[in-house]
């Protein structure tokens, strides 16, 4: 602990005879706190001064201690020791002590004794501490000089005594008076610039020049705090007011509420005097130590948000793949103009180039998917503009990450359902100009597709490649789009989660794409209803999601258009190769009410061109097959073997449909007992099941399957319960008893009175 003034600086050597020069700051403070008796402190002068030259002759003076006659202090020529006797204080000590102490030779032994009064007296007056000089009565000029020196040093200690106790016995709450003087100029730099707030949430800012109060006062409160200081204002330049200070008084008046404070500040024209209180935390000084480290630290120094890190990695991969794809597109475009006589050489070059591209993309992108338009033949793609060959870069999520949409509490909006993951069943290929190079590209595309499609399809990240089949009762076939619009937006983790949670049930926007802006008909059968509610709580009109295909033209024209497009565009060996378009919303297993869409760079208007393959046209022409064929999972072809089945936990065998649909299907299945089978393999002769919505204790809802209740039996049980005779027996103890309890004798009297009353009534009727 150091005691500093203008001329001298003393360091503490001992406390009650215990050497603290080797202790740390915290341990020295604890020694002060643990001292319950009279505190004796030995100090040493640390600085040289010109007065030392005048004290050479007094080096052999021996000065005794009056208060502690039993303690003998040995004073040598190389040390100047003193004692400060003060009452032990009980206040909390927050003392920034000095570092390692240095012994500096001095020529004068000095003994000082300071007696300090109570803490309240010290706050009332700075001169409250009494001073005593304990010296020997030795006649001589040197001793008188020593007395003058002692008086000077003691005066300096008394002058800075409040500073000493602020350092060592700092109070928990600091009270300070601050005077802010306004300027004459009417500018923003001459404003007080305090933003005050009370116990309410809303804040108000005071402009002291014009007297205008900006903001609203929420409520009256006794406690008014400073919530902020405006930059380049009077309070900001003063530097004494901090955020969190409580304003106790203004211009000598107690602050009652926020409105009164703002009024007083607005009325003051020259200066404002504020009395503020501030809570002092003892650990503030420890926070200034730059070498301080936590023993058990969980976060690294360079810790940032994990989501932001993933986004940065994603954008880096996207940029590298864009350059790679642009380079390959330019080189493949040059190969188109090679003469036919050099076609064999060009094929070899293109194939080697494609292999290099595949190797580079496999190494550089483990999380990014390169997906160009794969369904068009290379001859047809040669005639398309280069802008339509942009790649679609998508983000791959972890295979173990299962994402399920929750059921919203709002009954007016269409609920989002959990659905089992569906595997990829179709072959795709990277669109390159050489048929030789398309084979390894197909394998790469298929491998990447298997890894990325399972979870990302429910977040709207990429389309799902699947066969045309129906998995739900009464649902239309998935729409097949020949041409895929490209997407310029990179779906990062943060933006994807935000778009998923903010998706609405009013449908998705569509846009026209490229040169083929042909709006085709509805893919549903002619006799199919447009209702898209396939939930377990179908309430009729509550599902108001707009169907994206309600603006259809003549179905015959749509069929003709689909056939024409199929005959002109599909020219590849894989006749059944069909790719999805626009977004995953067209392939959701819940029909036409998709909800998550993708943005596209060249989709200017509100509708997208939709062209159907031959499979989609056949589904339009032929009516829906029987329920048994709809519910049965059709066998897969050879292409299915490349895609392993991915079984999602707990939901892989469930298809969420409405209870009315299940009841209707069960009724139909009873009439078709030959080959009737349900989704889970139960026979139609068993008890029919319906979906029920259950509620957990935490408020969340889930769907379970329960047997259909027999309504006549329920009504019969209710009637039997209501027709029971009311008694006081134990079998009806659960019923509510109203009225007093009559004893057995009283009930007998009641029966007799009733009997007499009936007898009297019969007599009157006979007369």
UniProtKB/Swiss-Prot annotation:
It comes from Drosophila melanogaster. Residues 744-755 have a biased composition (Basic and acidic residues). Residues 521-557, 744-767 are annotated as: Disordered. PANTHER family: PDZ DOMAIN CONTAINING RING FINGER PROTEIN 3, 4, SLO-INTERACTING PROTEIN 1. Pfam families: PDZ (PF00595). This is Slo-interacting protein 1. May selectively reduce calcium-activated potassium channel (Slo) currents by reducing the number of Slo channels in the plasma membrane. It comes from the Eukaryota. Interacts with Slo. One of its GO terms (molecular function) is potassium channel regulator activity. PROSITE patterns: PDZ. Residues 532-555 have a biased composition (Polar residues). Residues 202-280 form the PDZ domain. In embryos, it is expressed throughout the CNS and in several peripheral locations. Colocalizes with Slo.
